[in-house]
Structure formats: structure tokens, C-alpha cells
Amino acid sequence: MNRKILKLENLLRFHTICRQLHSLCQRRMLAQWRHMFSSAYAVHTAQLYTRPWQTDALLRAALSQRRLLVTKKEKRSQKSPLPSTKSKKEVEVWLGMTVEELARAMEKDIDCVYESLMNTAIDIDSLETHSRLDEVWIKEVIKKSGMKLKWSKLKQDKVRENKDAVKRPQADPALLIPRSPVVTIMGHVDHGKTTLLDKLRKTQVAAMEAGGITQHIGAFLVSLPSGEKITFLDTPGHAAFSAMRARGTQVTDIVILVVAADDGVMKQTVESIQHAKDAHVPIVLAINKCDKAEADPEKVKKELLAYDVVCEDYGGDVQAVHVSALTGENMMALAEATIALAEMLELKADPTGAVEGTVIESFTDKGRGPVTTAIIQRGTLRKGSILVAGKSWAKVRLMFDENGRAVNEAYPSMPVGIIGWRDLPSAGDEILEVESEPRAREVVDWRKYEQEQEKNKEDLKLIEEKRKEHQEAHRKDREKYGTVHWKERSYIKYREKRQQQPLKPKEKLERDSNVLPVIVKGDVDGSVEAILNVMDTYDASHECELDLVHFGVGDISENDVNLAETFHGVIYGFNVNAGNVIQQLAAKKGVKIKLHKIIYRLIEDLQEELSSRLPCIVEEHPIGEASILATFSITEGKKKVPVAGCRVQKGQIEKQKKFKLIRNGHVIWKGSLISLKHHKDDTSVVKTGMDCGLSLDEEKIEFKVGDAIICYEEKEVPAKTSWDPGF
């Protein structure tokens, strides 16, 4: 009876406690339960604490259900409400935003943008505040910042107005007047192009050129006895100056192709023909050196047939003139053939309006600053004209002809030197006249902007490629380490990281010795271009890396020396000077300055410098040779040692040198001798015709009658680079 009353009282108390479960957690509820039972019924505490929900299935189910409801409610109350899309802050963005502009639009610090771009494919270190962000990265920053993106129509649709200068439309035929032809003399090196031009000009240009080869484009206006004028461009024939020859054909009307009658068609001859065909320029053939006994003009004409240059003698339209630049033979005939072709072409130009032309060559003069040689193609150039070429502009201060005489005006087809450039334009740049200095600056700024846009596109392309590489590497890592235990994975990654750590000082020194940093300075833009084109053919980076640190036009400067010291490089100068102060500074800092006036000498020097960075090659030099006549073995201690009985056939055998065993043309063994005996006596040298017995430092080698023993010494010889620049 007492137990039933006790059970009823427990049920009543249980209902009271259940009402409190809505506001109390499980732990607090159990603590209160324990407290209530222990204070009211101390005698039955243990029983009351365990039995009501452990023994009664109904109570146990009710309590379990109550706990579940309370737990769900508490969890629901603990969850923070998700921010709705409407509550996100909208950020107005546009294409091509800079880091600074994006931070300002978000009303955040710039660091917020950098933090959002961390652990992405973009290179944070190279990211500046003015760097433009691609659409992908703008979206990434907005997303990580918990904001909503909104495209700005005004900014997105706004396109920068094109401010570039362009050529004028074609002139009215009524305004055109006849002009002199622009003739380019082309051909293989040393076929007499400059000597031929000397005869026409009655000058000695060839004698003044270093090494007797042309290394610039020379532009000259030649007046013939008949009163006709021809502008000649003398292009280099050397292999290194391919770009100059190509540039020469772009501004020319006629090409005089010079081929030596005793040498025939050569590599640069073929290249010159191709340049002329690409530019759709007619050719006049000048077969030079016809005064020589071995001259064969007909052979030259036949060789040219293979390159689609068909002379009039063979039914073609190419005029061929047999000349001798040395004696002056048929010089007038060549000039007349050129004038006749020019008349057929009906060359005309508009001498009015804004000037148009082309930069033939550019260089920096110490006293006059940047100077260009140009061909005027349209309009009349005068002092004070405002010109734009590439990303440079000029207000013409002075003009001069090929003889250095000042001129006031330059007409179409006239070569002229121009002084007044703010920066040095590149050879081949188009010259356009504009109305004012502000307009010139505007054009240059626009061209720089366009160049920057192109660079940004290339950079973004590289970034995207890098991102894909990282994703691919991450995917491969997951495949590689997916099934590996985390401890093993950590160890493998640690080991790989150790392999990628910076080199030790000794290793770094060895690595640096296989790199040649160079600084190239030239007298004119075209010369530097030619040297860089040759360096582009370098294909021996596996032997020694060729690192172009800096290049430019002008004499060697203090900055060049400091740069060479920083990179442990070599300075190469072509047709430039290095003053005494500069040379002393270079000597003090241990910097090599190498000056040359002939391009192939410079390239040879570069090859030698590259070779000096290579490890020496060990070569084998034979001293003597012996043939094995008999084999036997001797006992030394407890082991048998094989011995070969030999006769020296060539030279002599020296015990201290290296040896190799040859069998059927194959090397069986290389090493040293343990013993060398003549009869029964130890000896160090056995000469030709003498017999000897010898044993090797490797006991497992078995001798056979007829084998050859070669005695040789090893010598270290300097290695040579495998790079062949092509000349």
C-alpha cells in the first residue's frame, strides 16, 4: 500500500516538473529533480532517482518525447536568422575597376580587397592600388565581403574615345606631283652594295664602315648628271640585320638586288628577294664584280630562276645590268635602268597638308638628344612642325641632310635627319604631323593607354592560365593523397617542401655560374634590334642561361655599370663609347665592358663568354696501346689474381696513368693497374715492342687473348657552347 501511495505522489511531482521543462535545460532539470527528491524523501532517494522512468515504460516514453521537443526548441532558438538577399548591401561596380575604386565603392579599406583575393590565382604581390581587376576577381571580392553586386550601366557602357592620329585620306589626283624614286640596295654581305653606292655618290662610305660591312640603314639623295634624283637606302647584308632589310622594303619603290658574279646567289640574297616580293616591290638586278676573271653573270641569272626572278634575257621583266662597283663600269646604265622603271611606275606624291613619313633609323646624340633619320612620304616638313611617331612626339628644332647640312624644308622622297624628339622613337615607326603640342601629347597618351590595355589583357590571360594550373595541381594532389593517411600525407608534403627550399650558398654559386646576365647598348635603335634578334636564336639554355637584363641606345652610363654589378653581368656595347670615368668605375666594381664595332665580333665574344661559364670537358688522350698475348693467374695470399701477358704495340704504358680494356671494339673496363712487371721486375714504364705482365684493380675482369689495353691520360679542356647564331 505504501508503495502505491509513494508511486502516486511521484507521478504528481513528475507532472509538476514537466511543466518546467519548457524553460530549463536538461542538466538543470536533472539537478533540480535530484535536489527535490533528496530533500523531501531522503530515505528513498536512490530508489526515487532511478525507478520512476527506468521501471515504468510509459513514463520513460513520455520523458523521452518531452526531452526531444525541448531540445528541438532550444536548437531552433539558438540558430541565427540567415541574412536575406534584400538585407545585403549593394555595391555598384563596372568593368576595369582598379583595386582602389573597388574599395571605395564597397566603403571598405583597400586591405579588405587584398584579403578577399588571398588564396586565389591572382598574384597579390604584384597587385597595386591602380591595378585593374578582371570581372572574375571583382565578383570574388564582392561575394567574400558578403555584399550584392550591381553593374553600373554608366561606367560599363562608357568607352574611352579614340584619340589616335591617323593618315589622311587619299589625295586629289590634281594635287599630286612627280617625286623621286626611293630605291633600296639589297643583297648578301660583302657583295659590294655600299661600294656600288659610293660610285654613284662619289664618296667613301664603305671605307668608313667598320670591317667593311654596312651596319645601319643609310639614306642618301643622289643627283645624277641627267638631273634626276634618286633616294637610296643602303641596307646591311649581314645575317643579323634581317629586320633592317625588311624595314627597308616597306618604304621603297624599287629594289636593286646586288649579286656578286663570282659568288652567286647566297642566303641573304634569297632573303632579300623574299622581302621584295612580300612588299610587292619590283627588282632591278645588278650583277657586281664583273671585272673579276672568275665572274660568271649567266650562272647568276640561271640560279635566280629558282627564286622566280626572271631576267629579260630569259623572257622575264627583271632588268639585269652587269656592273663593277670597283671600276665604275656600267654605273650610269644601272642608274638609267632605275629611272626608266620609276617612270613606268609613275611615282607621285602630295606635297601639301600634314606630313607623313617613316622612321628609318633612330639614335641618341650626346649634344642634340634623340635623333631620327626619316623618309618623307607626303606633305612638306618644316621647322616647328609637331610630329608623332609611335609613343614619342617632337617639335622640329632642326633638320639636316645626309651630309649634315641644315635644311629648312623636306619634300616627299627626301631623306632627312630630325632633331627635337622628346623620346626616342623606334625604327619603322610611322611619322604623322598633328596641329599642336597638346594634340601630340593626347595621341601619345592614347597610344600608351592602348598598350597598357593590351598588356592588361595579356596579364589576365596569364593569370587565368595560372589559375587553371593551380586548380589542376590541386586536383592531382587530391587524387594523389586522397587515400593516404593524414600523418603520411603531412610527411610527404613536408619532404616535397624541403626540396623546394632556397639553395644553399654553395649550390647557389654553382647555379649562378651557369647564368650570363648581359646589358646591351647600341648606337642606333636598329643595331640594338639586330643584336636582340640574334640573341633570340639562343637555344643552349640547358648549358648556360642567357639573361638579357637591359638594353638601350647610347653610350655606356653609370646606371649600366651599377645594373651590371647588381646582376653580376657583362656590358656589351656596339658602336658606342665608355668614358674614362665609366671604365674606372667598372674596373672598381669588377664589371666587364666589351665594346665592338663589328656585329659578328660581338656575337663571337658573347659565345666565348657563354663558353667560359660551362664546366670543363674531360678528354682522353691515348699514351700507349698493348695487345694481350696470354692469360694466367698468380696466387697472392689466399686468392688468385688474373694476369695478362702483353706486348706494347704503340707508344708506352705508364703505371700511374688510366687504363681501359677493349674487346671487339667495346670498352669492358676502365680503371688503374695494381701491378706492372717486365719479366719479373716491377716497372713504371714499358715502351713499344717490350713484353709485360699486368693486373687490374678489379679482380672479376677476365682477360682474353686478343684484347687491347689502352693507356691514356685525362685532360680538362674548356667547353664550347653549342649555340650557333647562324653566321
From Swiss-Prot:
- State where the protein is found: Mitochondrion
Disulfide bridge positions per record: none
Positions binding GTP in this chain are: 187-194, 234-237, 288-291
Region (G2) residue spans: 212-216
- Which Gene Ontology terms describe the biological processes this protein takes part in? mitochondrial translational initiation; ribosome disassembly
The transit peptide extends across 1-29
Q: Which UniProt keywords apply?
A: GTP-binding, Initiation factor, Mitochondrion, Nucleotide-binding, Phosphoprotein, Protein biosynthesis, Transit peptide
Q: For the region G3, what residue ranges are annotated?
A: 234-237
**Role played:** One of the essential components for the initiation of protein synthesis. Protects formylmethionyl-tRNA from spontaneous hydrolysis and promotes its binding to the 30S ribosomal subunits. Also involved in the hydrolysis of GTP during the formation of the 70S ribosomal complex.
How this chain assembles, per its entry, is:
Monomer.
What is the protein's name according to its record?
Answer: Translation initiation factor IF-2, mitochondrial
Q: Which organism is it from?
A: Bos taurus
